[in-house]
Amino acid sequence: MSNTISVEDVPLNRFHRLLTVRSGGGSFVDGYVLSIIGIAMMKVSPALGLSAFWEGLIAASALIGIFFGGFIGGALTDRLGRRVLYFVGPTLFVVCSLAQYWVQSGEVLFALRFMNGVAVGIEYPVATAFLVEFLPKKNRGPCLATLTILWFAGAAVAYLAGEAILNFGGPDAWRLTLASTAVIGALLFIVRLGTPESPRWLLSKGRHAEAEAIIRRVYGPEFGLDNLPVQAESKNLSFANLLHSGYGKRMAFVAIFWTCSVIPVFAVYAFALRCWMRCTSGATGHPMDPLPLPCCSWWAASSRLA
């Protein structure tokens, strides 16, 4: 028995909630992996004998990786599918984070942090594509906003976990701090097992039978390809074509806005603790005094997006 209800208008179901957790877990790990360096750097610099130049480069390495990872993730998710790329990020988190435990030089740490950044960059287009293509249209905004909230939650947990590890982890605690992301990355990989491919992507590749099977699995046996909204014919456009098709100014606005927003926030998470300790040198202060920064950011994001 079929119906005429579009999958865009169905109620939020268990699969949608689980998919939000799966994609939101990526944002949580992103916030954790990008912020943990802020507290670990307190011990990393003297242990590896880093200069101010290498401190800054290592702190910025993940941000550089995100730039490249975003392009890579966007291109590969259209070519290879959402599901394949959905597991690349967690895999890189685990491998690169574990490798940081044995790091012996600033150059190697830079490379590993860069690859962690690439993993974060891949996460953004893949996770959002999954949510947009599966969620009902009335629930997309709130669920996508949840990703931002979870990013700040991950950043706050990074400060708490990092402080705990540094206090009780012994002389090489900074290595455990950097490697701790592997635990969350492994959990994220496990949680994402069983995620189906996007039926919209399958349709774009002419794999209609697979797409219909997934639609029935997610929405119920009474749903099929006819319940998907009509998709515009896909065209392969170059970056230059995109810029000259009326989207150039919009892209510039978004790019400039996010650059001016992200870089200062990233700098705060990477250097706030170190600057705080230098400013309070010789005075009474605790390393976790700056913790309200990520916690307040999390609260502010939650309040604005609720």
What are these regions (language model features)?
Residues M1-A306:
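Transmembrane-helix signature of 12-pass secondary carriers
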